[in-house]
């Protein structure tokens, strides 16, 4: 699936990575306070970020495969051996991560067809997701949603 394709693309770039983990999303842009950072660590969170939700849920609803590749910029403020988060340092790491991400995406595109799974439940999750009865769906609504739900709205 998509995660395996991402992993293969990352390996081609020799980027250190960790597969799996718990992601905490916070509204941003902002940096965590020490109290927030400590709370997230008490939850055993691996990464704290400002994206991924609601994107992951919306992608699933549109039968779009979604994988998160989080490229870390800092340790947040909890780490005793690192200084507090500094915007300039974050930007420097972010720019380096952007280069890595572009190369990873090129590799992902090149090898993606090897990872397509016809049995992936993402292919048909809309079959059981639409609550509105077919006779209650207006043509205007079907036209509006045809790009993301046309397959099931034709039924």
Where does each model-flagged region fall?
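Glycine-rich phosphate- or other oxyanion-binding loops that anchor nucleotides, phosphorylated ligands
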Residues: 1-80, 88-95, 105-110, 119-155
């Amino acid at each position: 699936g998509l995660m395996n394709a991402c992993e293969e693309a990352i390996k081609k770039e020799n980027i250190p990575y960790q597969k799996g983990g718990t992601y905490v999303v916070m509204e941003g842009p902002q940096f965590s306070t020490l109290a927030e950072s400590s709370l997230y660590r008490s939850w055993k969170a691996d990464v704290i970020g400002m994206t991924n939700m609601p994107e992951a849920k919306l992608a699933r609803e549109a039968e779009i495969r979604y994988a998160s590749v989080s490229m870390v910029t800092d340790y947040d403020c909890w780490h005793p051996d690192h200084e507090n988060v500094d915007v300039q340092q974050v930007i420097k790491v972010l720019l380096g991560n952007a280069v890595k991400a572009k190369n990873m995406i090129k590799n992902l595109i090149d090898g993606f067809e090897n990872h397509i799974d016809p049995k992936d439940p993402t292919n048909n999750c809309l079959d059981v997701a639409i609550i509105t009865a077919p006779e209650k769906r207006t043509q205007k609504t079907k036209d509006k949603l045809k790009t993301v739900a046309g397959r099931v709205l034709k039924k």
